[in-house]
Amino acid sequence: MKLYNTLDKKVVPIKPLKKGKLTIYNCGPTVYFRMHIGNIRAYVNWDILHRALIYTGYKVERIMNLTDVGHMSKDEDFGEDKIELQALKEGKDPISIANYYISTVLEDFAKLNILSPKGNPVDPNMPLEKLEEEGWTRATGYVDEMIAMVKKMEENGYTYETTQAVYFDVTKIDNYNIFTNQSLEEKQEGVREEVGVDPEKKHPADFVLWMKRVGKYKDHTMHWNSPWGDGFPGWHIECSAMSTSVLGEYFDIHTGGIDHLPLHHPNERAQNIGTFGHPSVKYWLHNDFLTGVEDSKLSKSAGTGASLPEVLSLGFDPMDIRYLFASVNYRVQLRFTKESLDGARNARVSLISKLRNIYRESNQKEGEILEDYKRQFIKELENNLNVSGTLAVISGLLKSKEKPEDILTTIYDFDKVLDLNLREETERKDMDIPEDILKLANERVEARKAKDFELADKKREQIESRGYRMIDTEDGFTLEKI
């Protein structure tokens, strides 16, 4: 397997710390709102990575955090705690807010076939006390570990204390901005507006490890006792504490978005060096953003985010979204529009239509996996998770002269990685389309040929009123039950 390591700024061979096993930490959601579709892209990407690693022979130990305290607005030390702010808006306590939005994470993961970090299908009704068993770590469950890390950094000379907080001194770290190669002088220019919030702060890039319950935070609802007084952890220490507590002071892969490159991930790396005397992460992977109509990043804080239920309300299937995300490499910016979703839906429906035809030809016999095609499939996966290349392998296989049952068995095997429900959709028993629906569909085709678009629209409406959806494909059309 070769993946793009942001530290090396190139695609490199993955060499596990322990032979045959990879340890992975996924930066997970801050649970103060329903994830927007830009967040979800990342989790689909890393789900496919997890599946690909298992498919190619690795054992995987993976965890994902759930940030339920200390993540400030605009990612600044002295912003508003996002969860406390949402609790105030909704008139609830912060834990109730976190619990509710964790339940929506489970719902969205289940709909999109995103496995739990442990590699199991997600039960959307899972009791939240079972989260840890499935590989999710809640920040509030690791406060003791965070305090222990801050104490160790303090002993090692990487921190200083003010009347408001305990800070990490970034000048003690060589190559602090290793991800962006930005100098501390440039960093100082970039954060100058924050100077003066704490007059005792030594450098604008220094960041909070522990915030005291004083000043604007004197009434902070979530707080714990510590050697530095009553308070709560900074955002960055949470990920360092959770990842190393579970995976150890060395682990293989850390994932996140490119928005983590300027601040969060340099701070995590600095904390690990300050605690252990060395970096903890061998490979850093970062996904790019989704863009919308104006090419602006889909961001909830900008008011342009769309949740999964909102997208599905437009008539799309969850697998249309999964297919779209799989069709573009995780490191490439992806335009998320109705047009791109329409294209993904048409491609997915066309694929299933072809598989159904092959299924009928196979006489429902089980076949054998075609090893030559499997080697091609794995080659694409190992090329920096080139999932679009695996879709091309499937396309080539569909055009081949191989036995129908072998084609199906091989593609079903590939779907262990893609998980587009290909077997279920291909072998559905309710896909016998009534003759009157087929007649309406063919009449719509003829109306379109005659450029009678008003009649064509009328026929489509009649089809949909009967509970079916007609989708145009390169081979003509397909019908599916709504």
Predicted segments with their positions:
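N-terminal, positively charged nucleic-acid-binding surface of large information/translation enzymes
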Residues: 8-11, 17-111, 124-127, 472, ...
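Structural preference for alpha-helix termini/caps and helix-kink/transition segments
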Residues: 296-300, 304-482
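Short, glycine/charge-rich beta-strand/loop segments that flank catalytic centers
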Residues: 63-69, 101-105, 115-146, 164-173
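The substrate-binding groove and active-site-proximal loops of carbohydrate-active enzymes
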Residues: 85-94, 134-140, 229, 257
